[in-house]
């Protein structure tokens, strides 16, 4: 076979392993099946040994990692279903379809579990939009997400977007979907019942996306442009029909098991379901509805055509299934049956064209513990001499520059393209600390966020990853939600490089430590490696998707200033940390220093305090202090509430560091004057420092530091800078 396995991404050792499993050389169809199932994208062969360190158990966990999505109990016989996935490589090549099918795929993962999807979030990373290609990627990724979500009628309620040089040419598109299901109606992908029919439902099968999973397990290069056929094409209207047909099907007792067809198409759905159930499956390819003529067994088994599901049905119920799908104008074809021998047997024209043990494709995939070493530049990049950072003269200009930086400026240009109000349950819309979606027929709501500062993770993956978890949990607490579960998307470079494996390992350890401390289980997730462009890796970017529970939706809090004369209080301690900060990057062009330190116990106390203050109705607004420090948080709350602020700070720090330090575990709250003493007392009981720093008043932002006026600007001037930046960047030539 002239080492064709290498072209399919398999190593010589892996090929030898396949021969020893089968006791013979594989044919081309079998080789294709192994190449996709043993790719990093499907097998997690470089990350699985590390992922076992993540905490996955908890009192609310109904389903942890290993199924199509994670499931958490939220009481009242309801559960929340959540998952995040990447579509980075396809989006780099064909951004519109890459992003759109990323959204389509994650939605299918949710309704496969029996849940109705209620919200989408997207976590995006791009290069600096100062060249045509980057702008093209941004425009088309956002349009792809918007069109798919808007057409299928699921609101895109939140997410996060960062712009850094390291993502140029390799953008990150991580899509998260959340659904609600009654606990006794959860569906799983565990095939059982010898002789039960296997059906493919939904769209027809074509040649799109063949080998997409293997493609997603390689570095991007000049040649990647030629791999556009590896990018699938999505049809959101077809998916809407598929969603409704599946939910109607789940109301019957016909379904034994169901799995969506994502990466590796029919191959992965068949072997994953069979191996979970300890059974085999026989598939007759002549019965698969095709949209193109002359397709080979290899092409049919590896096609990643969208909007398809594989269903194991109770014997004799085939007609019931066909009736439902016919009503919705969709295919439902019986293509095979469950067998007792543990083999995936594929038949075409009456002949066996592939026959492999199901478990050999899934559980027996190789696993690698790679060599690691600390990157040679790591110590150097952490060094920051504060004397290199001269205190600026004009602090008004600095404040304008920081809040109009790409990472802090309003992302309205992006989210205004999304319909975030469809289904009418969105309580807190994009642009706030966390999105909130109410659950119909209850007083409950779910708060959602995605977070990760890749720059911190570049400077220190262990600490940066802890901060990503802490920031996500803090964002949920700011709206009054108790964090209940994590879904993570680990975006890294090539793990075969020792420095990258070191980043991946330390990042996972950091996430594990933070999740254990906060007692938040990781219930699902995704790993995306080989994110490199012309040999340069992206910043390590472990995106944390998190859900929080609000028992009473009337008690939520938001970040906008509400009332004149309210007292502004900072919770938490400013340690004067500008390493890795937005201030350092924007005003001095530096990405260096230690990222802010994080004390997880202090963070926990802050979060518990804010939840108590919100629950008891003692505060009028709350906003976490993160990128851009106190000054950015102040301006964001002021803009959101259309009210100015007068601030007076006493500090031993330099004025610029006091304002723009990104020290963790801090929040900005506003309190009615008569409640201030009670708030300070409760903060003291929680051992959280609390400092009165000013009042909400007027239409200007005025800041005095140690008695000296440092900043005095009309809010509308700041708002203009903050609101207009991304639109301006995207429209200029």
Curated annotation (Swiss-Prot):
Q: In which pathway does it act?
A: Purine metabolism; IMP biosynthesis via de novo pathway; 5-amino-1-(5-phospho-D-ribosyl)imidazole from N(2)-formyl-N(1)-(5-phospho-D-ribosyl)glycinamide: step 1/2
> What Gene3D superfamilies does the record point to?
PurM-like C-terminal domain, PurM-like, N-terminal domain
Task: Tell me the residue numbers annotated for binding Mg(2+) 2.
Answer: 109, 260
Catalytic residues in the record:
41, 87
Gene Ontology MF term list:
ATP binding; magnesium ion binding; phosphoribosylformylglycinamidine synthase activity
Q: What is its EC number?
A: 6.3.5.3
- Note the subunit structure: Monomer. Part of the FGAM synthase complex composed of 1 PurL, 1 PurQ and 2 PurS subunits.
> What protein does this entry describe?
Phosphoribosylformylglycinamidine synthase subunit PurL
Q: Which species is this record about?
A: Caldanaerobacter subterraneus subsp. tengcongensis (strain DSM 15242 / JCM 11007 / NBRC 100824 / MB4) (Thermoanaerobacter tengcongensis)
Encoding gene, per UniProt annotation: purL
């Amino acid at each position: 076979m002239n080492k064709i396995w290498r072209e399919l991404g398999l190593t010589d050792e892996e090929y030898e392993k396949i021969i020893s499993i089968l006791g013979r050389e594989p044919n081309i169809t079998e080789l294709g099946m192994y190449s996709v199932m043993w790719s990093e994208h499907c097998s997690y062969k470089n990350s699985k040994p590390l992922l076992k360190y993540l905490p996955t158990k908890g009192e609310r966990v109904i389903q942890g990692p290993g199924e199509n999505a994670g499931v958490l109990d939220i009481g009242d016989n309801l559960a929340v279903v959540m998952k995040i996935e990447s579509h980075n490589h396809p989006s780099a090549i064909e951004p519109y379809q890459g992003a759109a099918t990323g959204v389509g795929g994650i939605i299918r993962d949710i309704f496969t579990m029996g849940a109705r999807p209620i919200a989408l979030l997207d976590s995006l990373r791009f290069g600096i939009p100062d060249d045509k290609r980057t702008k093209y990627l941004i425009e088309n990724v956002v349009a792809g997400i918007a069109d798919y979500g808007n057409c299928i009628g699921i609101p895109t309620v939140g997410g996060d977007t960062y712009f850094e040089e390291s993502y140029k040419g390799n953008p990150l598109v991580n899509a998260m979907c959340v659904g609600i299901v009654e606990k006794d109606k959860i569906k799983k992908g565990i095939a059982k019942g010898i002789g039960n029919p296997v059906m493919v439902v939904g769209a027809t099968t074509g040649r799109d996306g063949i080998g997409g999973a293997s493609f997603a397990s390689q570095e991007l290069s000049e040649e990647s442009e030629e791999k556009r056929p590896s990018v699938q094409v999505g049809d959101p209207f077809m998916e809407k029909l598929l969603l409704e047909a599946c939910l109607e099907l789940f109301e019957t007792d016909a379904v034994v098991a169901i799995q969506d067809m994502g990466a590796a198409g029919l191959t992965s759905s068949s072997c994953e379901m069979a191996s979970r159930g300890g059974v085999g499956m026989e598939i007759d390819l002549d019965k698969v509805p095709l949209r193109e003529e002359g397709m080979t067994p290899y092409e049919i088994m590896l096609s990643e055509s969208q909007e398809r599901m594989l269903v194991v049905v109770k014997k004799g119920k085939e007609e019931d299934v066909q009736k439902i799908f016919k009503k919705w104008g969709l295919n439902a074809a019986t293509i095979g049956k469950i067998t007792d021998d543990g083999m995936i047997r594929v038949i075409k024209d009456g002949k066996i064209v592939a026959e492999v043990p199901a478990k050999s494709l899934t559980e027996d995939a190789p696993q690698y513990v790679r060599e690691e070493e600390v990157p040679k530049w790591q110590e150097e990049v952490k060094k920051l001499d504060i004397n290199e950072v001269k205190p600026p003269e004009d602090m008004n200009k600095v404040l304008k520059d920081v809040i109009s930086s790409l990472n802090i400026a309003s992302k309205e240009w992006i989210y205004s393209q999304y319909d975030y109000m469809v289904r009418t349950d969105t309580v807190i819309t994009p642009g706030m600390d966390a999105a909130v979606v109410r659950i119909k027929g209850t007083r409950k709501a779910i708060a959602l966020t995605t977070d990760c500062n890749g720059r911190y993770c570049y400077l220190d993956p262990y600490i940066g990853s802890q901060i990503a978890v802490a920031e996500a949990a803090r964002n949920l607490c700011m709206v009054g939600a108790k964090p209940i579960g994590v879904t993570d998307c680990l975006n890294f470079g090539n793990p075969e490089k020792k420095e990258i494996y070191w980043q991946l390992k330390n990042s996972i350890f950091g996430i594990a430590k933070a999740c254990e401390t906060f007692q938040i289980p990781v219930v699902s997730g995704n790993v995306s490696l080989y994110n490199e462009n012309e040999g340069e890796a992206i910043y390590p970017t472990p995106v944390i998707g998190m859900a929080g529970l609000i028992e009473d939706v009337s008690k939520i809090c938001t970040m906008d200033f509400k009332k004149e004369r309210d007292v502004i209080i900072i919770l938490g301690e400013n340690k004067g940390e500008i390493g890795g900060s937005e201030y350092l990057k924007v005003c001095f062009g530096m990405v260096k220093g230690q990222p802010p330190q994080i004390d997880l116990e202090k963070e926990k106390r802050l979060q518990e305090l804010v939840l108590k203050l919100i629950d008891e109705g003692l505060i009028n607004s709350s906003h976490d202090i993160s990128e851009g420090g106190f000054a950015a948080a102040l301006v964001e709350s002021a803009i959101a509430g259309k009210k100015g602020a007068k601030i007076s700070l006493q500090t031993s720090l330099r004025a610029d560091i006091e304002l723009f330090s990104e020290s963790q575990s801090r929040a900005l709250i506003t309190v009615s004057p008569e409640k201030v003493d009670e708030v300070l007392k409760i903060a003291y009981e929680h051992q959280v420092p609390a400092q009165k720093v000013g009042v909400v008043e007027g239409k200007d932002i005025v800041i005095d530091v140690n008695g000296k006026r440092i900043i005095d600007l009309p809010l509308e001037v700041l708002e203009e800078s903050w609101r207009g930046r991304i639109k301006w960047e995207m429209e200029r030539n």
